[in-house]
């Protein structure tokens, strides 16, 4: 083989020692998060969701599952989307255990609660992420357990029927506009599997649809991202690292905002 895509950290380390391959580092261009069902108790309480966000140490997640690689994010957008991305949101919920405990107390859960994290069993990185979160949430009295399910079951029970409490997955985009990642969280969207509902968010999206000014649209999308962050709609984690190994007698590999493998750009150098 001349190319290996989406390598694990172990595979990357092995191939990095092989002079026959060059490693290319980029982002996977998806929003990995602990997605929270906003209508299921106690996650229907914004203070509970915020507490979960403050309890997490996302850099530790990256360190433990990907040798520190990846980009911490704070809303449903990733860096490759450029003008739509709001980088400062990644600092909104820096780990603060005492603040998390206080929020739980205010929400009526001073002793914590039990949480089920449903994870598709064919994505090891999501399973590993869930395992790190389980340990981190213990610090605020939240007893989390992981429920692994087949991918088909995840699609039907979690995504379609919304029968879940929380889940770790990555959500990507099909096209290059803010709409691709943000429309799904409007209250009536069939893709709104977390049951997020915010009238202001819906109004902002309607403004986007009627606006013909690109700069205005970008600012509206940024406001939507900020609302998702402020409401702790989900516990946002990262745009996972994407590493590709290309045999050294080839060059020209490129990363794109969407997941594509543009083989036409690769050329032989020897």
What are these regions (language model features)?
Residues 71-106, 124-126:
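Structural transition elements
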Residues 105-173, 188, 214, 242:
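Ligand/substrate-recognition segments at binding pockets and active sites
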Residues 12-25, 161-164, 177-192, 248-251:
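Ligand-binding "clamshell"
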Residues 1-40:
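Extracellular/periplasmic solute-recognition and catalytic clefts
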Residues 244-270:
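Long beta-strand-rich cores associated with HINT superfamily self-processing modules
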Residues 47, 145-154, 160, 180-248, ...:
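Extracytoplasmic/peripheral linker and loop segments enriched in polar/acidic and small residues
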Residues 25-36, 39, 43-82, 188-202, 228-236:
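Periplasmic-binding protein-like
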């Amino acid at each position: 083989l001349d190319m290996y895509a989406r390598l694990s950290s172990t595979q990357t380390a092995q191939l990095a020692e092989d002079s026959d391959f060059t490693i290319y580092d980029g982002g996977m261009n998806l929003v990995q998060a602990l997605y929270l069902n906003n209508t299921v108790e106690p996650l229907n309480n914004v203070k509970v969701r915020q507490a979960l966000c403050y309890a997490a140490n996302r850099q530790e997640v990256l360190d433990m599952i990907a040798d520190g690689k990846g980009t911490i994010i704070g809303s449903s957008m990733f860096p490759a989307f450029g003008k739509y991305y709001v980088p400062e949101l990644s600092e909104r919920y820096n780990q603060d255990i005492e603040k998390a405990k206080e929020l739980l107390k205010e929400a009526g859960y001073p002793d914590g609660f039990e949480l089920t994290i449903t994870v598709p069993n064919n994505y090891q990185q999501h399973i590993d992420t869930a395992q790190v979160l389980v340990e981190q949430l213990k610090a605020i009295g939240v007893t989390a357990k992981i429920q692994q399910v087949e991918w088909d079951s995840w699609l039907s029970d979690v995504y379609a029927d919304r029968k879940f409490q929380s889940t770790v997955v990555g959500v990507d985009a099909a096209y290059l506009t803010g709409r691709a990642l943000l429309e799904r969280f409007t209250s009536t969207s069939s893709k709104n599997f977390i049951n997020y509902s915010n009238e202001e968010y819906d109004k902002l999206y309607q403004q986007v649809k009627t606006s013909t000014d690109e700069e205005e649209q970008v600012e509206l999308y940024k406001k939507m991202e900020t609302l998702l962050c402020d409401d702790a709609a989900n516990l946002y984690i990262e745009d996972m690292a994407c590493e590709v190994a290309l045999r050294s007698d080839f060059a020209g590999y490129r990363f794109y905002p969407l997941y594509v493998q543009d083989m036409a750009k690769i050329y032989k150098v020897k």
